[in-house]
Amino acid sequence: MQSPAMSMVTPIFPIPLKTNSSKKNFYTTFLTPHKLTLCLLIELYAHRIIQPQHCVPFLDLVLGYFNPNDSQPQTLTRIHDITSHLPSSIEEYSVYSLLHERLWSLHSFEDIHEIFISLGNYIEGVYDSEEEAPHMLFSSSSLLSIFLRKCVVEYEQFSFEQGVQFFKSFLQYRAPSMDFQHEGIEFCKINVRHELMNLASNKTLLQLAFGSIPVSRSSRDIEQLTQVQIEHMQKFGCALPLEMKEKLHDLLEVEENNLNTSYYCKFLNSWFSGDYQQSVENLCRYFDHIMHSDEKVSYQYALLNLAMLQADFGCNEEALHAIEDTINTARESGDTACLNFALAWMFEFKRSQYSNPSPEKNENDDQILEHLARNSQKAQLPILQTTVHLLQVQKFLDDGSSLIGVFSNLTKAFALFCANESFDGFPRYMDLLQSIWYRLGCSILSMTYISIYQKNHVHDSPALDLLQSLITKAWRYAELGRWLDVATILSTAEVQSQRSFQCAHLYGREKTFIYLSKAIDEKNHMDATLYLKNLNGFRHDKMSTFRTQLYALRLDISLGNLSQAIEGIDKLLEEPEKLAIEWVLQLMFLKVDIYMRTEMSNRAVFELLEIIQMASSNYLRLYLLRGLCTLCLIGELDCFTAIDLLDSLIPDIIAADNKPLLALAFHAFASLQIKHLDLLQPSRMFVIQLLDSAIDGYRACYMVEMQKTVVRLKIQYLRQINDPALQPNIEQYCSRFYSDNLLN
């Protein structure tokens, strides 16, 4: 007699079977048959079936599915592979043997219902019997208790129809376990309450008896996993079209015992947890399986994932090779959406690697943008049309070629957002808008746009975009000297940083930069050195690598290592094509600082004139204002020319809402008044107010070195006017100056 498990269905049934139909999915929020099986494992653990020395693999197995972002494959095969080697407290039985028996003792929806009703008895505070519990009780705050409660709460919210659907999907999930244990066949013969003996293990007969059997999937697992992947792909500012988002979602929609999906989930899980080696290995296995299956349409998406992975871990050349393969594969397969996105991503990625490109590269970039604009419009892909306009904005800003082009493309991008009622690329748009106004010297408007974005898009924004917005706001508050607000914003950012591995590194790195800058300004060299060392523990992109070098140079200057600092600056400036214009200007300002400290005013003026020319041609108004104020401070300009210049700059400096810049303007104005005291004959009150305003501005930003410079200037002025009544004030200022007690 043929074994029930090995029986084949012959076409004698009057009901036609749909052998090629796609699998129907039954969506839940968290609960799946796999998590029901984990609940049964927790039951065994509570009854001390699992030996203490083997508890760690069991707990790792359960906790691997606690967080929806942990995208482990939800198959009984995985549980079997782990628990079949774990001996139980019952001799000659493995943990899986007892679990297998428990699984096959569930014959109806009522049996599953009883399971969920009884799970609360394993939690302290819920178990209300006066007798001592015959099993272990879990603390109500433990992760196992939380896992059980999440499963029970969702099950209790099922309608009757949903409960039946869940039972059907459980039968589908359990069926493959017939191959794991031969005694399971005999067990099913005796206990299964169906008229057809092999119904429990035969998928075809299950379909005949119950109709279409859905695969139970956790919508939270899929949605969160897809969302995190989309955030990583949009890291360089290129928004994904809707059809690509749907494709990424569909890659996770197939049956969970599908090896392709299993390796794909493992790849994503390793990637998001920061395990580069394991993620590459799982992605290679995914490549192998899709090449030997009928899913070759997914090949360009696998290559796209490879490019994102390599870029995320700093392997830039490998990322460019992978994205070029993606472009070729997408072109061959006719996937216009993937092709255009890959081209846009490559353009943006190359721009981030070569901040000041050569003319030949600029010409090539122009061709890519023209191709993207033409293709996205022809294919009616509004999200990519928007991306092209935003890329044009960034290119105009980098080149400093056309402010009209900047605002023209911003307007077109916003019109597309409104016309299509799709705001997928809106974080990128808002970030560009606030950065443009900041560059133009209108910090108040920049902060307004940041606040609007955070207020209205906090729930639908990608985690990285929202975190970057909070970090930008913290930097703006630091410029205003509002350090209590900085601490508040960083506390909010810390909560957001827990959403992914990349967010955690971004938050930790930027927070360190903020307090490193403050420590250098305070001349707190011990803390600054410690912060600089701590930066080695974070992942860096090209910009953060440069900033680390910049702060190291600032620390050298603060310590008095001027020769070492000037050598480091010249070395960085040897390859200007690798530096953004703003980075070059920051290095040039450091050279000006060194020249002023060593009283080489002619060289300082030469550098400042070049800074002013570069800042003006690239619409970097804050750098322009700072350069002009510093030029006035050095005192090489004609007295009245310098005063007229400062008078004309003050309104723009106030609009910039930048305290160090405003303090510098007051400092320069006071210095001119004191230097030309006989010629200008300013009132004593006017000069002292200028000096005090400069001191207050520097104090708010913890700039100790500049405070000392202004206090020294004030002492010089008070001595110069030679008023005996001011002698106590002079002694007071001298005492503060020499005691370094300038922050009180």
Swiss-Prot record:
Instruction: Please name the Pfam families in this protein's record.
Output: ANAPC5
Q: Give TM regions.
A: none
Biological process per Gene Ontology, one example term: anaphase-promoting complex-dependent catabolic process
Print the keywords alphabetically.
Cell cycle, Cell division, Mitosis, Ubl conjugation pathway
Cross-referenced InterPro entries, in alphabetical order?
Apc5, Apc5_dom
Q: How does it assemble?
A: The APC/C is composed of at least 13 subunits: apc1, apc2, nuc2, apc4, apc5, cut9, apc8, apc10, apc11, hcn1, apc13, apc14 and apc15.
Show the PANTHER family listed in the entry.
Answer: ANAPHASE-PROMOTING COMPLEX SUBUNIT 5 (PTHR12830:SF9)
Protein name (Swiss-Prot/TrEMBL): Anaphase-promoting complex subunit 5
